[in-house]
């Protein structure tokens, strides 16, 4: 277009005339330029000039302050959409110039100005919204230039998406743009620390797009990792991954729980757990970010579990279900990441051994060890349950109906007995103590060895915990004479199951001076492969 035409265009945008005839010439010129931008060579040539992007920006700047009450809105919107289409097409060839002059931000502000006026049809607004998303996506394919002073416009633009959630095309355009803008650490930080993020992440993404338009919720419930995902679901998981691996995600989760309650908090946690536990590749920054907020929640829920047991028999007693659900998810994430040395070092450096043993001890003292005797024919005090043998932490058989009913109902273990949680804790101790003498010593000094040994039994509350404990004991004793001496003294008091030691690769010997000591017994040791296979059954 010539300079005169740009001048005419700018005047038209500024004046917003009511006569539809005044728009015809400019609309025809825009259509011609749009056609040119669809031809690759011509598009590349036009996009190489800074001038056209400055002219497009000037159009948007003028348009932001225009009152459209007297305008011929249908024709005016054709002009606006034409300008955005030209920018969208040109940004395929050049992303640097439009970002450097903050053209995406200017277009967002222009859209928001138009959306606040009542003269435009819903259809026109929806089309314009989608075009702005497409343009912004093109601009940010390789790099993101984010101006924090424009965050409010970005937030308002994201919230606008709630108006168009029924349109699949707009949903896809929005999702692609959002996945790109999430490359900006500054953008994510601003988002996660803003109360309005609840509306964007929980209401729009989780309960809107993800719940209504993807199979992600079904994937979480069915735990089917082989299920094929739609392209939209893949994009949504990419967005969530960018959020989860940011250091501010923990702050968002606390706000979510406080403002929207447990249901929303737990829904997010379930999806996040599925995402983290099914992903194999993390860089050090991502691991650190996930561990940071996850470990904080783990520590908080250790305190809450302790408080739960202390108040269990009082009028202030709370429901264990929410505690168990979140604790299971947190520990699922931690044990999944614990295979990485960086994660092990992180947990060790943040007093992880002490924190894990603290929760282990709380559960050991308050939860029952349960064995369902399905073929014994014995009668249980709770007639609704199958025959069961339940013992406390010192081995006393529990027959009190009130106590049993708190922990077992209809042949199912209640959440108040925190089923499976100790398995996670033993796995974490195993990961952290492998070839780490300082950790091995810490476990002994914190009385963790006794906890692990006392769980080398069949316990339906913690399936295959015996096998996990054997693996853990093997790691705790390896090349650690002090721990071996400690175990040998327990063995002398008949406090250790000899079969457990044998499977762990040790046996008790008496030397020439009559001293009891442990020696390696690899010939009778159970293979780790077999123990892991038993655990994974």
Swiss-Prot record:
It is found in: Cytoplasm. Keywords: Cell cycle, Cell division, Cytoplasm. SUPFAM superfamilies: ARM repeat. GO terms for biological process: cell division. It holds the Pfam family Atx10homo_assoc. Transmembrane segments: none annotated. GO terms for cellular component: cytosol. InterPro entries: ARM-type_fold, Ataxin-10/CTR86_families, Ataxin-10_domain. Belongs to the ataxin-10 family. PANTHER family: ATAXIN-10. May play a role in the regulation of cytokinesis. This is Ataxin-10 homolog.
């Amino acid at each position: 277009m010539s300079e005169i035409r740009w001048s005419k265009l700018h005047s038209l945008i500024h004046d917003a005339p009511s006569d539809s005839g005044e728009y015809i010439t400019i609309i025809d010129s825009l259509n011609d330029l749009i056609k040119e931008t669809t031809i690759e060579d011509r598009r590349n040539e036009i996009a190489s000039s800074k001038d056209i992007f400055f002219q497009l920006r000037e159009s948007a700047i003028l348009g932001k302050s225009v009152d459209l009450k007297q305008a011929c809105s249908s024709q005016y919107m054709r002009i606006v959409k034409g300008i955005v289409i030209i920018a969208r097409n040109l940004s395929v060839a050049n992303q640097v110039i439009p970002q450097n002059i903050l053209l995406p931000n200017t277009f967002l502000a222009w859209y928001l100005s138009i959306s606040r006026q009542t003269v435009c049809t819903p259809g026109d607004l929806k089309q314009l919204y989608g075009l702005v998303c497409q343009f912004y996506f093109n601009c940010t394919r390789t790099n993101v230039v984010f101006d924090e002073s424009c965050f409010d416009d970005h937030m308002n633009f994201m919230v606008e998406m709630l108006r168009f959630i029924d349109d699949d095309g707009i949903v896809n355009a929005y999702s692609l743009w959002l996945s790109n803008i999430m490359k900006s650490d500054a953008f994510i930080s601003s988002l996660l620390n803003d109360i309005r993020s609840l509306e964007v992440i929980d209401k729009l993404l989780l309960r809107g797009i993800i719940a209504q338009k993807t199979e992600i919720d079904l994937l979480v419930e069915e735990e089917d990792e082989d299920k094929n995902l739609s392209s939209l679901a893949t994009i949504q998981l990419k967005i969530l991954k960018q959020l989860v691996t940011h250091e501010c995600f923990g702050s968002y989760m606390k706000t979510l729980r406080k403002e929207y309650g447990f249901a929303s908090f737990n829904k997010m946690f379930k999806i996040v757990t599925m995402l983290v536990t099914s992903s194999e590749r993390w860089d050090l920054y991502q691991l650190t970010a996930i561990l940071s907020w996850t470990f904080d929640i783990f520590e908080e829920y250790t305190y809450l579990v302790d408080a739960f047991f202390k108040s269990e028999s009082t009028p202030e007693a709370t429901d264990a279900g929410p505690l168990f659900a979140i604790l299971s998810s947190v520990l699922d994430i931690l044990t999944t990441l614990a295979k990485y040395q960086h994660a092990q070092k992180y947990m060790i450096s943040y007093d992880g051994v002490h924190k894990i043993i603290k929760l282990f001890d709380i559960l050991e003292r308050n939860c029952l060890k349960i064995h369902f005797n399905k073929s014994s024919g014995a009668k249980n005090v709770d007639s609704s349950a199958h025959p069961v043998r339940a013992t406390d932490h010192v081995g006393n058989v529990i027959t009190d109906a009130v106590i049993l009913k708190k922990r077992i109902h209809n042949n199912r273990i209640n959440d108040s007995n925190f089923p499976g949680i100790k398995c996670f804790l033993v796995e974490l101790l195993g990961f952290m103590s492998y070839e780490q003498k300082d950790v091995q010593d810490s476990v002994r000094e914190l009385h963790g060895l006794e906890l692990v040994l006392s769980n080398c039994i069949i316990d339906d509350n913690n399936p295959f915990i015996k096998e996990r404990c054997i693996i853990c004991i093997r790691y705790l004793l390896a090349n650690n004479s002090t721990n071996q001496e400690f175990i040998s003294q327990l063995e002398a008091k008949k406090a250790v199951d000899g079969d457990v030691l044998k499977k762990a690769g040790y046996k008790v010997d008496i030397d020439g001076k009559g001293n009891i000591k442990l020696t390696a017994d690899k010939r009778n040791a159970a293979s780790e492969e077999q123990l892991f296979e038993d655990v994974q059954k």
